[in-house]
UniProtKB/Swiss-Prot annotation:
<dbReference type="Pfam" id="PF00494">
    <property type="entry name" value="SQS_PSY"/>
</dbReference>
<dbReference type="InterPro" id="IPR044843">
    <property type="entry name" value="Trans_IPPS_bact-type"/>
</dbReference>
<comment type="pathway">
    <text>Carotenoid biosynthesis; phytoene biosynthesis.</text>
</comment>
<keyword id="KW-0464">Manganese</keyword>
<dbReference type="GO" id="GO:0004311">
    <property type="term" value="F:geranylgeranyl diphosphate synthase activity"/>
</dbReference>
<dbReference type="InterPro" id="IPR019845">
    <property type="entry name" value="Squalene/phytoene_synthase_CS"/>
</dbReference>
<protein>
    <recommendedName>
        <fullName>15-cis-phytoene synthase</fullName>
        <ecNumber>2.5.1.32</ecNumber>
    </recommendedName>
</protein>
<feature type="region of interest" description="Disordered">
    <location>
        <begin position="290"/>
        <end position="309"/>
    </location>
</feature>
<dbReference type="InterPro" id="IPR008949">
    <property type="entry name" value="Isoprenoid_synthase_dom_sf"/>
</dbReference>
<dbReference type="GO" id="GO:0051996">
    <property type="term" value="F:squalene synthase [NAD(P)H] activity"/>
</dbReference>
<comment type="function">
    <text>Involved in the biosynthesis of carotenoids. Catalyzes the condensation of two molecules of geranylgeranyl diphosphate (GGPP) to give prephytoene diphosphate (PPPP) and the subsequent rearrangement of the cyclopropylcarbinyl intermediate to yield the 15-cis-phytoene isomer.</text>
</comment>
<keyword id="KW-0125">Carotenoid biosynthesis</keyword>
<keyword id="KW-0479">Metal-binding</keyword>
<dbReference type="GO" id="GO:0046872">
    <property type="term" value="F:metal ion binding"/>
</dbReference>
<dbReference type="InterPro" id="IPR002060">
    <property type="entry name" value="Squ/phyt_synthse"/>
</dbReference>
<dbReference type="GO" id="GO:0016117">
    <property type="term" value="P:carotenoid biosynthetic process"/>
</dbReference>
<dbReference type="InterPro" id="IPR033904">
    <property type="entry name" value="Trans_IPPS_HH"/>
</dbReference>
Length: 309
């Protein structure tokens, strides 16, 4: 299957859903880019279905199903896609094409859906490891699927791809702490809140911004070794893919830096990168993609969170 309309749908989804990744996605070769965009479209669709949104915006009509029912629908359609059924929704038709073309294991897809299940059942996060497990399901396993699209099959490089997903999600959580709180979700370790004298009821209140900024700084700093680990994985990717991934890494890491630097004002406006900043980071990433091939990399640190094998 090579349906142009599926690619158009995926391009539109990326353009609206993730301006941070849209620039990086242009660096892939055409075949890889198609699959990357279509996998992203499926991930975004699943996220929106659970939240009863369209590309992050609230649905105009009240939900006709409960979150539990919507999750069951996603699971059913994912099983149908793997079974070879004709998929009529663009996001699932796109996913079916990608999964079949790149031999993406059903376990990865359902690991991703487990992240949405954690939201639906309002999972609790006591320690950082609990938060990292959530990060794995919503982003780390996406890194695994993306790496497979790029031809990666060895576990060492897959570990690094998962690490990048973990870093991205830690950055996401830091950036979106207040928005998530308004949506009734908290991914912060309860032990961290307790350390700052906060709880799930008051942590996002304006008067607690100073303490919240310290928690955000911890998240950003926790992401650093995962970004560093991901850098070591660039050598395992085709060069253009390495450039694209290095660009995404640089852009997203910069968002975390901005959250940390903004301190108490981090949530006055959504932290993002400007077009000139993206272009500067893109150029820096080209050098990183090249130099990653020219030096030996140390083994992955043993203290990092380990994905399920």
């Amino acid at each position: 299957m090579n349906n142009p309309s599926l690619l158009n749908h995926a391009v539109e989804t990326m353009a609206v859903g993730s301006k941070s990744f849209a620039t990086a996605s242009k660096l892939f070769d055409a075949k890889t880019r198609r699959s990357v965009l279509m996998l992203y479209a499926w991930c975004r669709h699943c996220d929106d279905v659970i939240d009863d949104q369209t590309l992050g915006f609230q649905a105009r009509q009240p939900a006709l199903q409960t979150p539990e029912q919507r999750l069951m629908q996603l699971e059913m359609k994912t099983r149908q896609a793997y079974a070879g059924s004709q998929m009529h929704e663009p996001a699932f038709a796109a996913f079916q094409e990608v999964a079949m073309a790149h031999d993406i294991a059903p376990a990865y897809a359902f690991d991703h859906l487990e992240g949405f299940a954690m939201d639906v059942r309002e999972a609790q996060y006591s320690q950082l490891d609990d938060t990292l497990r959530y990060c794995y399901h919503v982003a780390g396993v996406v890194g695994l699927m993306m790496a497979q699209i790029m031809g990666v099959r060895d576990n060492a490089t897959l570990d690094r791809a998962c690490d990048l997903g973990l870093a991205f999600q830690l950055t996401n959580i830091a950036r979106d702490i207040v928005d998530d709180a308004h949506a009734g979700r908290c991914y912060l370790p309860a032990s961290w809140l307790e350390h700052e004298g906060l709880n799930k009821e008051n942590y996002a209140a304006p008067e607690n911004r100073q303490a919240l900024s310290r928690i955000a700084r911890r998240l950003v700093q926790e992401a650093e070794p995962y970004y560093l680990s991901a850098t070591a994985g660039l050598a395992g990717l085709p060069l253009r893919s390495a450039w694209a991934i290095a660009t995404a890494k640089q852009v997203y890491r910069k968002i975390g830096v901005k959250v940390e630097q903004a301190g108490q004002q981090a949530w006055d406006q959504r932290q993002s990168t400007t077009t000139p900043e993206k272009l500067t980071l893109l150029l820096a990433a080209s050098g990183q993609a090249l130099t990653s091939r020219m030096r030996a990399h140390p083994p992955r640190p043993a203290h990092l969170w380990q994905r399920p094998l």
